């Protein structure tokens, strides 16, 4: 289990994602054209995949398959491409392995980008999804949709603030909105990357915050060309929090669960928990702000742990201290309002129980046979002084009580 946004090692991140995706980590990198998708894939592969390929020949071949990237408005990627061509099998230090690769897409067209037309007419290209040549725009969008729906297990949307390809931010918005809407419809986990020349600047962070409000998804400002391994680890860890929440394990004072089924306190707490469960869908929903429990009888709910590999979160529910005494009074009919009144009641009940235990067996006999005998306890017996008696040629000891 991890707490909140506790940092994980690269192995832990890979292992958790691999468990969530059944051992295949296929990252579909999608978004508008000329936003930096190929640059991101190249940097990701160089830092996160290639160093983990043990076979030197395989590593060299994978390096040759990395996409080309360049500045300007000309579209560099012309068809979807798996990077590397064959999935890389990566062994984890803690045991187990997974297969990983990225999928580079052409992306959705952006007004002002170059390369999708020839002689002022749509550029026709051949695509594995069509029997005949089709316009570049159509092939690009179809390929992107097929990659996300049929191949990728997780998604990364790469868009930009307009500082990376000589195209203003406004040009990217239609394509950006379309791809995010489609990802929401498909339901696969994804993260939004905002490619900027200055990702640490105030405008970049302000735009990222604005996008998070619009898309209701985490947005990470990055510089795709200069990403570090630590930044990529953070991206993957954030991506883990976009997986579905499968189970909520709740702990609360044990006496609450011992109440009769349907008790008013149980009903109010359980109903509040059901409402909370209905309002969260992803692991990240539990970490973005404190979980809220709408129940007047509780002191709140605390996130105590998360199992990112299987989608479980652990919550602890606190109960108002006065509620315990209130329910104790209701259930017993005794005037119990606090600890001071509880102790005398407990002492009195203990004496009553001791007295009852003496006659308990006799009462059971009465119910069974009509009469019962109350046997005295050891503390009630008085032993007389033993007396030696003689009867004929025999001696004995007479005990009287």
How should each PLM-predicted stretch be described?
Residues 113-166, 182-183:
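Inter-motif core of Ras-like GTPase G domains
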Residues 178-191, 196-263:
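Canonical P-loop GTPase G-domain recognition
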Residues 171-177:
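Charged helix-capping and loop-helix junction motifs
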Residues 3-131:
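Conserved G1/Walker A P-loop phosphate-binding module
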Residues 128, 153-155, 159-163, 168-169, ...:
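P-loop NTPase catalytic nucleotide-binding module
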Residues 5-14, 19-21, 25-34, 44-47, ...:
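P-loop NTP-binding site
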Residues 106-110, 161-164, 197-200, 225-228, ...:
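Conserved nucleotide-binding/hydrolysis micro-motifs of P-loop NTPases
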Residues 91-96, 147-151, 182-186, 213:
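Conserved catalytic network of the ASCE P-loop NTPase/AAA+ motor domain
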